[in-house]
Amino acid sequence: MLSPQKTKFRKQHRGRMKGVSHRRGNHICFGRFALQALEPAWITSGQIEAGRRAITRYARRGGKIWVRIFPDKPITMRPAETRMGSGKGSPEYWVSVIRPYRILYEMGGVSETVARAATEIAAYKMPIRTRFVTASPV
């Protein structure tokens, strides 16, 4: 599963998922087809990997897949049945902060029917509503 090799700080604030992914990451850059998020959410590294595997399995050897998101936010948890106080919990897993219209996966080198079916399977593994988008012909 994906995680950063090194970070400046071990723990982060939870933050807010306000706003829309306006400029960065909401256009198709590499492939012809993509899976686009429609809701804000935290997507864990396990969910990202599950979606990637689903697309890879369906597309077989044909085509190429680009994962456009990376889990760079540590989520901390405290042990069960622990009393209040004594600091913040230790990092348990990593998430990627997703805002609406963010591109999650891109595909190229396959037909539209294959890409649509593969992204539909990957979308089922995501905790948010998504849509299938195609690159506009230039």
From Swiss-Prot:
GO terms, molecular function: rRNA binding; structural constituent of ribosome
The record's region (Disordered) falls at 1-21
Keyword Chloroplast listed:
yes
Fetch the CDD domains from UniProt.
Answer: Ribosomal_L16_L10e (cd01433)
UniProt-annotated location(s):
Plastid, Chloroplast
Q: Where is the composition biased (Basic residues)?
A: 7-21
The answer on whether this UniProt entry bears the keyword Lipoprotein reads no
Instruction: Give UniProt keywords alphabetically.
Output: Chloroplast, Plastid, Ribonucleoprotein, Ribosomal protein
GO annotation (BP), single: mitochondrial translation
One Gene Ontology cellular component? chloroplast
SUPFAM superfamilies per the UniProt record, alphabetical: Ribosomal protein L16p/L10e (SSF54686)
Family the UniProt entry places it in: Belongs to the universal ribosomal protein uL16 family.
Q: What assembly does the database describe for this protein?
A: Part of the 50S ribosomal subunit.
* Alphabetized HAMAP family for the sequence: Ribosomal_uL16
Annotated protein name in UniProt: Large ribosomal subunit protein uL16c
What is the scientific name of the source organism?
Answer: Cycas taitungensis (Prince sago)
The protein's gene is named rpl16
